[in-house]
Amino acid sequence: SADITPVITGFQGINAEGDITTLGRGGSDTSAVALAVALEAEECQIYTDVDGVYTTDPNVYEKAKKIDKINYEEMLELSSLGAKVLQIRSVEFASKYNMPIRVKSSFTNDEGTLINGEENMEDALISGVTHTSDDAKLTIRKVPDIPGIAAKILDPISSKGIDVDIIIQNVSEDKTTDFTFTVKREKSQEAKKILSNLSKEFGGGEIELNEDISKVSLVGVGMKSHAGVAATMFKTLAEKNINIEMISTSEIKISVVVK
């Protein structure tokens, strides 16, 4: 009514100190969802260079299919595991306020992909497959097998802002164990240096760093009600002579680290 058209920046904002700052990669996605919530819109439409969310990266597998509808939980997993269609904070915000998101192409009139809170257990067992090749695996040998040792290893890592993903601790042998975890490759040398200092402190063994790994993940809410998905995945990899080095699972996700 005031004949005013607001123009709002999507990629920048103001922090707690009142300074202008950027929101990071995909920040405009989060801004769009926040505005949709504030304006009580029916849905938030995000236009991009792809026409929706696909079952996997179509640049890697040309037979990837576009997903018509997916729920917040699955989209959060896909975003956190490497799918670059939506910024993870935008999906978290949409889930918190139950704001549907529709991802559409700027170049076509296709309906795109709708992301909302509905769960349809009759849908496809697996919604998507993701892969990342920017991880590194670190192992510290002969760690004393005592209570609190995992926290002692990971606290200095997290205090430096290094995110730890998959963690494995071997069965104790001679009161020592091997402790293995993954981090982003760009942080691997810093993490290795921290582990070297820790190993000297509590008499641990050598530190091993492997940057030649990839992580492959299956995501699907249908896994909540279907058994045998992990076994099928592992059998398929074995048939291609691909050895699994680490495994991580949740109700709707299976991730494996391979060479």
What are these model-derived regions, one by one?
Residues 1-259:
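C-terminal catalytic "cap/lid" subdomain
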